[in-house]
Amino acid sequence: MSFEQGFNRLWHTIAGKFRKRRRERFVALFPPDKISSIVDLGGLVSHWDGEQRDITVLNLMPQESNHCKVLVGDGRHTDLPDRGFDLAYSNSAIEHVGKWQDQVAFAQELQRVGKLVYCQTPNRWFPLEVHYLTFFWHWYPKLLRNYFIVRYFTGWGWLVRPDRRRVQEYADTVRLLTYEQMKELFPDCSVERERFLGLTKSLIAIGEPSQNFARAEAPESRAGAPVRR
């Protein structure tokens, strides 16, 4: 087995355990008998395989599904109705939508369209940058984040073997958030810390928005690409 193959297997084993634990926590918080309609902003239909609820997935890219309603759109500005879903959900998407003002718009859309909110994102202060699968990557100077370094010296480069366009796309769109920023984006929600080895790996905003959010104005540019895990 090559080093890349071993790394791939190890990462998918660890990531799979986190997904399983997070899924169990999600079902406990939002049981199907109480939460029947869910909208996923910026998600993938494969995330909802086996789910029996009424699921709507909105993403920039077209997707096909036999079990989800699929919409093509920008999560920062949607035509979805106010409080039109029992739960507005997002998993590892808000860090991809652009600058701070784009993240504000995305967070407000989640709180506008859902009676309840669930928004997960990687923690900026976790030492391992989970998109590049490299320690301290998000703290390196931009000069080092070039194609050659990304392709041959990051875990993501080994696993995905991205082309130059995708490397640049990640560089332009990934903006990680802190606990304090998540509290600011979701003032009515509790922000849970998902830990690994005692360190906060991910942040999850969960709660019921108490204020009414107006639909945001249409953004000048489209939001970033979805995460593929």
Which ranges hold each PLM region?
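Conserved class I S-adenosyl-L-methionine
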Residues: 116-149
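Conserved Class I S-adenosyl-L-methionine
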Residues: 189-204
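Short, glycine-/aromatic-enriched active-site segment of Class I SAM-dependent methyltransferases
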Residues: 132-135, 155-169
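Short alpha-helix
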Residues: 168-190
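A short, conserved alpha-helix within the catalytic core of class I
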Residues: 97-114
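Conserved helix-to-beta-strand junction in the class I
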Residues: 109-113, 120, 185
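Conserved N-terminal segment of class I S-adenosyl-L-methionine
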Residues: 1-82, 87, 199-202, 213-229
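A short beta-strand submotif of the Rossmann-like class I SAM-dependent methyltransferase core
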Residues: 87-93
